[in-house]
Amino acid sequence: MSESAPAGSKEGVSFGNLPRPEPRTSKDQQKLSISTDVKKPSHSAPVTPVRSARSSMEQPTFRPVAKNSVTVAPARAAGFCPPQFEEYHHGRSHSLVSPPPSPHFLKRISFDTFNNKAATDFSLTLKTQHQAYKWTRTSRTFLCGMDGNSYSEVAVDWLFETLLADNDEAVVLRVIDPSSKLAEDLSDEQSYRSLAEHIMAGILKKVDDDKAVSIIVELVVGKPQDMILRTIHVYSPDSLIVGTRGKALNSFQSLLSSGSVSKFCLQKSPIPVIVVRPDRKRVRSKNKRLKDKTRKSYMEILEKSGR
């Protein structure tokens, strides 16, 4: 026995209380296809194809920029503006050239009294200083007398090698006796100046480049004894250094000989005096004392001092 399909069903499908749909016709399908078409609104902008947009990115338009600037064309075309940098041009005006090295000793002062016709004595002063020289409360001033003899050169050498230290000042006094032959040869001011510059150049060769000292050359025409006392009064040095011939005489007889400048300095100088003998004669005297058996105490002192 077979069951019959309920009312309101089609081919075994039940629609319940819903109204039964009507079958679609060819006219209804035509209306549905027309309604599904997308119509472009009148207010929308035209759509650019993707390929044409890429071609416009590859061919950007350029804007004139400054000559000395750095730009990136692809970044500008993409809407990014990089910061502007001025280009550095290396030329003579921008090149860093080190200045020539300055000399270790610089000229500071130079004057003379040759133009003063009323003066009885004439003098010429040359002064030079190391570029690192600086006067301090512990700075010392030394006066060294010299002449044309070799023993005076020994005194100058000993001063700069042994006694002179940084920030000290050395005054080298060169006295020319008016009655000497040298005074006759030096007839004009230029000849005196040339002699003073020659003395200064010889002294600078004796000084180490790293020794910060001040050097003064006093070239004076007059009596040596009077000029020494006058120079001591002007500069107030701490001590006076002079040379000696070192004759083979006992004790201070050679220093106190008649007419000796060292004798005058020892007797009349208001400041301490250092008398320097030539090196070879000092070594000879030292060896002689070492061989003397009666001076054992002196030899012991030398051994303890390491000399």
From Swiss-Prot:
One of its GO terms (molecular function) is catalytic activity. The keyword Phosphoprotein applies. It is found in: Barrier septum; Cell tip. Keywords: Phosphoprotein, Stress response. Its main location: other. Residues 1-63 are annotated as: Disordered. Gene3D superfamilies: HUPs. One of its GO terms (cellular component) is cell tip. Residues 21-30 have a biased composition (Basic and acidic residues). This is Universal stress protein A family protein C25B2.10. It comes from Schizosaccharomyces pombe (strain 972 / ATCC 24843). The lineage of its organism: Eukaryota, Fungi, Dikarya, Ascomycota, Taphrinomycotina.
